[in-house]
């Protein structure tokens, strides 16, 4: 008699805990290293309260078993089992399966095996389901349920005898509130943070809304750091703020910063079970609340029991990747020296993100914390100018490169170098330096936009930063021109809302064609053509198509190009043996190397300099991984 996992669709809340438990169980109980490695054998179809988990039915006389030409699939122990060593990737089983639950992964069939190799003997998905919507069933049990339902229906008791739904009892009735926000009329007059931190009552309210889907929940998985989100939210419920801060710092080096600048709507909050029900739990605000509150109470990371090691590591770059790497190494007892060409730590966090999103005193406080942990910072120190790369590789046991991507993408339009046309990063950096009391630099000259018509080309978060900075600098008008529709904008939804509230005008579905200048060569307008959304490209995003005859000019005194970032030149790497790809990014993790190890084995790299411009949290995760790889290298040498 066959056994299989049966789902009670009415009780499924769409939390995806079953998928995560399955993927983790088949990865030695560890998080998969990447989303491409996330391969659950059970799948939730639909979403919210219309969701339903689907897995292999382990059929008697299974069509997949009959179809397999090499006997890789056999019926044993009341279930259909797969011998991956025999599988030849012919796909006959996937075609034969009437339920579509046999997949091909890297040319090998994959299906539910009822966790037959799991030491506990239990099925991971059943074990973790918060509403008990999954159960191990056989044909006899299924028939009994069917007969019982038929009898109730015949007796007219199907509805009157219905039990209260477990899923309905679990889901909260309170809707999301989030953090208070300063009014647009007030906040656009200054550069202070616009979001107020949660107070204890607000934090309790939000934490009480969490349904604690599972210890390893969907929000954990969609956080690149795999923060223990349900667990630290539970600690907030219990009033254990110090313990929550300790837990946050186990997986994150900058939780108070991520709580402010992470695009939670695309990560943890976007994966929250309550997103389409009563609104996602305000995870980012809770993360900020935990760390801000704990630090205000005097909490600091305790490194008093750290045993010093003999190794020394040089970290190039004091951005999120470098700080993440230094944090892990310092906690392991390694002596760490961080080198950065800027006068303060943080990289883009300090000089690329405006103060109204991230107050710079937050970075100053974090620098004090890292210094107290034993990390030495060498600022205003540029590799190749103040110290050579070969000096670092000869003096240190390992080197980490986390320099980010500071190259700016161009549009290749006529007159792109005309007066009044500027790039986003120099614009943002110059004004941030001014607010910090730093002198104006030749690399980052100030741009006066007061009383001028400002147009920003782009649609990401950097675009929003330029727009909102221009508003605060008293521009006469500020307009965003983006070639796709609003739904296709790559930036955070809340940043678009904030910009619109503050007075930014949006021109969607317009593509730049040229830059118009007067007889003196100064900018007067940007030539645009309207677009219509076409079919999706290889990346899944719909492509804009120019609409013939729709050309027009948008007057502008200042035009800011915000098309994103790419690798910048690193001449100090020449002759080192470290390989770059065709985009100028550092190559790591080739066969025979650790994931973040370059072709020069004592040099590691991570963050945007390896993967291209991405998020603060992904850069930090890469830096922390590099530190773990270094420790693996050190321990291997020691043994």
Curated annotation (Swiss-Prot):
Start and end residues of each 4Fe-4S ferredoxin-type domain: 3-32, 47-77, 78-107, 110-139, 201-235
UniProt binding sites for [4Fe-4S] cluster 1: 12, 15, 18, 129
CDD domains in the record: HycB_like
Induction annotation: Induced under anaerobic and microaerobic conditions. Expression increases in the presence of hypoxanthine, xanthine and uric acid. Expression is reduced in the presence of nitrite and nitrate under anaerobic conditions.
Keyword set, alphabetical order: 4Fe-4S, Iron, Iron-sulfur, Metal-binding, Oxidoreductase, Repeat
Cofactor or coenzyme needed: [4Fe-4S] cluster
Keyword Repeat annotated: yes
Binding annotation for [4Fe-4S] cluster 2: 22, 112, 115, 125
One function term, GO molecular function aspect: metal ion binding
Keyword Nucleotide-binding carried by entry: no
Binding site for [4Fe-4S] cluster 3: 56, 59, 64, 97
Stored PANTHER family: GLUTAMATE SYNTHASE [NADPH] SMALL CHAIN, GLUTAMATE SYNTHASE [NADPH] SMALL CHAIN-RELATED
Function of the protein: Involved in formate-dependent uric acid degradation under microaerobic and anaerobic conditions. May reduce the enzymes necessary for uric acid degradation.
Protein name: Putative oxidoreductase UacF
């Amino acid at each position: 008699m066959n056994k299989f996992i049966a789902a009670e669709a009415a009780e499924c809340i769409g939390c995806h805990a079953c998928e995560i438990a399955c993927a983790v169980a088949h990865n030695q109980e560890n998080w998969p290293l990447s989303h491409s490695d996330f391969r659950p054998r059970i799948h939730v179809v639909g979403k919210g309260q219309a969701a339903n988990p689907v897995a292999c039915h382990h059929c008697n006389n299974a069509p997949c078993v009959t179809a397999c030409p090499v006997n890789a699939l056999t019926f044993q122990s009341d279930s259909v089992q797969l011998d991956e060593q025999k599988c030849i990737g012919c796909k006959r089983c996937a075609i034969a399966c009437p339920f579509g639950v046999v997949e091909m992964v890297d040319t090998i069939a994959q299906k539910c095996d009822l966790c037959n190799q799991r030491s506990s003997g239990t099925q991971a998905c059943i074990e973790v389901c918060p509403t008990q919507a999954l159960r191990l069933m056989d044909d006899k049990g299924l028939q009994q349920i069917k007969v019982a339902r038929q009898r109730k229906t015949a007796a007219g008791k199907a509805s009157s005898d219905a039990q209260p739904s477990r899923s309905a009892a679990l889901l909260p009735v309170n809707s999301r509130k989030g953090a208070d926000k300063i009014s647009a009329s007030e906040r656009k007059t200054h550069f202070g943070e616009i979001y107020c931190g949660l107070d204890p009552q607000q934090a309790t309210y939000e934490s009480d809304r969490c349904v604690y889907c599972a210890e390893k929940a969907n929000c954990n998985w969609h956080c690149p750091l795999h923060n223990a989100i349900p667990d630290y939210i539970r600690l907030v419920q219990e009033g254990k703020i110090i313990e929550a801060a300790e837990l946050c710092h186990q997986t994150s080096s900058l939780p108070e910063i991520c709580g402010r600048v992470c695009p939670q709507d695309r990560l943890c909050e976007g994966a929250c079970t309550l997103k389409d029900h009563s609104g996602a739990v305000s995870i980012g605000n809770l993360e900020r609340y935990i760390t801000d509150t704990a630090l205000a109470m005097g909490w600091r990371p305790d490194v008093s029991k750290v045993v010093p090691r003999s190794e020394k590591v040089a970290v190039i770059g004091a951005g999120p990747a470098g700080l993440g790497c230094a944090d892990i190494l310092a906690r392991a007892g390694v002596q760490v020296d961080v080198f950065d060409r800027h006068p303060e730590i943080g990289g883009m966090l300090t000089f690329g993100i405006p103060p109204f999103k991230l107050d710079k005193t937050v970075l100053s406080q974090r620098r004090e914390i890292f210094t107290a942990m034993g990390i030495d910072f060498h600022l205003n120190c540029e590799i190749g100018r103040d110290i050579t790369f070969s000096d670092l590789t000869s003096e240190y046991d390992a080197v980490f490169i986390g320099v980010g991507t500071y190259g700016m993408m161009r549009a290749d339009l006529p007159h792109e170098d005309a007066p009044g046309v500027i790039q986003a990063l120099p614009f943002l950096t110059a004004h941030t330096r001014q607010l910090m009391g730093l002198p104006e630099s030749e690399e980052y000259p100030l741009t006066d936009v007061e009383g001028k018509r400002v147009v920003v080309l782009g649609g990401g978060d950097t675009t929003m930063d330029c727009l909102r900075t221009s508003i605060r600098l008293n521009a006469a008008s500020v307009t965003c021109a983006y070639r796709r529709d609003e739904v296709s904008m790559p930036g955070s939804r809340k940043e678009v809302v904030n910009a619109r509230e503050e007075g930014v005008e949006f021109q969607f579905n317009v593509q730049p064609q040229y830059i118009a200048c007067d007889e003196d060569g100064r900018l007067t307008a940007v030539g645009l053509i309207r677009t219509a959304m076409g079919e999706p490209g290889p990346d899944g995003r719909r492509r804009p198509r120019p609409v013939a005859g729709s050309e027009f000019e948008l007057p502008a005194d200042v035009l800011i190009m915000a098309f994103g970032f790419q690798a910048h030149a690193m001449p100090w790497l020449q002759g080192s043996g470290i390989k770059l790809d065709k985009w100028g990014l550092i190559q790591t993790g080739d066969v025979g190397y650790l994931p973040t190890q370059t072709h020069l084995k004592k040099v590691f790299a991570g963050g945007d300099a390896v993967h291209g411009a991405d998020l603060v949290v992904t850069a930090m995760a890469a830096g922390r991984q590099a530190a773990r790889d270094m420790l693996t290298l050190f321990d291997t040498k020691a043994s």
